Amino acid sequence: MNRNINFNTEMSIFEHLEELRQRIFIAALIFIVITAICFTYMKNISYILQQPAIGIKFLQLAPGEYLFTSIKVALYSGFLLSSPFIIYQITLFILPGLTKKESNFIVPILFISIILFFSGIVFAYIILVPAALKFLINYGNEIVEPIWSFEQYFNFILLLLFSTGIAFQIPIIQVILGILKIFSSSEMYAYWKYIVLGATVIAAIITPSTDPITQIIMSIAILALYSSGIIILKILNK
C-alpha cells in the first residue's frame, strides 16, 4: 500500500492488517535476497572474518560442518545487512499512528541506534577480536599448536560482534530513560560506582572469551558509552 505518511489519517483494522502484511512481505523479501547474496559470496565473507586469525589452521571436524556454518554465517550476515531496511519498513508502518512530536523523537532514535550497532560491530572487529585472539593464541603456544574448528571459530566471532553491537545501544537506552523522566543525567552520574561494577560484569557476560584483555577493553568501552549518554542528556537538559 503505497501512500504518503499522514499523521492525521485514520485506518480501519483491515487496512492496518493489509499494511502490516505488505511491510512484513517486503522485509522478508529483502532479508531473503540479501541472505542469498551473502551465501553466494561466502568465500569473501569467510576471508574477511578469518583475517584476525591469520596463520591459524581451520579444520572441518564433521561432515557438512563448513556447509552448515556457511548457512549460519549467511543468515547472520543477511540479518545484519538487511536490518536497516527492515527497521525502515517497521518505521513506515508505525509512523502514521504517531503524533508529529512522537515521530520526531522515535525516528532519530532508530537512526542513531543503527549507527551505534554497526559502530559496535566495527569496534569489535578492529579492536576486540584481534585482542582476544592474540591473547588466546599466545597463551600456551609453546605447548600446543592452535588448530581450530571452523564452526567454533565463527561462533566465537559472530557472538562477539553481535554482543558488542548490542552493548553499544547503552546511550540509546539512557536517552530514552531520560526523555521519559525515569532517570535524570544527575541520577545516572550518581550511580557511577555501581556502573563500574556493572560494566565489569556485563563485559564478562557478553564476551565469549575469558581473557582479561578483552574484558578490560569492553569494560572501558561500556563506561565510555555510559558517559556519552550522560553528556547527551546534559545537552538535552534531561
From Swiss-Prot:
Family membership: Belongs to the TatC family.
Entries under PROSITE patterns matching the protein: TATC
GO molecular-function terms, A-Z: proton motive force dependent protein transmembrane transporter activity
Ranges annotated as spanning the membrane: 24-44, 78-98, 109-129, 156-176, 188-208, 216-236
Principal location listed in the UniProt entry: plastid
Biological process terms in GO annotation: intracellular protein transmembrane transport; protein transport by the Tat complex
Keywords: Chloroplast, Membrane, Plastid, Transmembrane, Transmembrane helix
UniProt lineage: Eukaryota, Rhodophyta, Florideophyceae, Rhodymeniophycidae, Gracilariales
GO CC term, one of those recorded: TAT protein transport complex
Alphabetized Pfam families for the sequence: TatC (PF00902)
Domain of life (superkingdom): Eukaryota
Record keyword Membrane present: yes
Protein name: Uncharacterized tatC-like protein ycf43
Entry-linked InterPro entries: Sec-indep_translocase_CS, TatC
Localisation: Plastid, Chloroplast membrane
Organism whose genome encodes this protein: Gracilaria tenuistipitata var. liui (Red alga)
Membrane topology of this protein: Multi-pass membrane protein
Statement: the UniProt record of this protein carries the keyword Oxidoreductase: no
Signal peptide (UniProt feature, chain positions): none
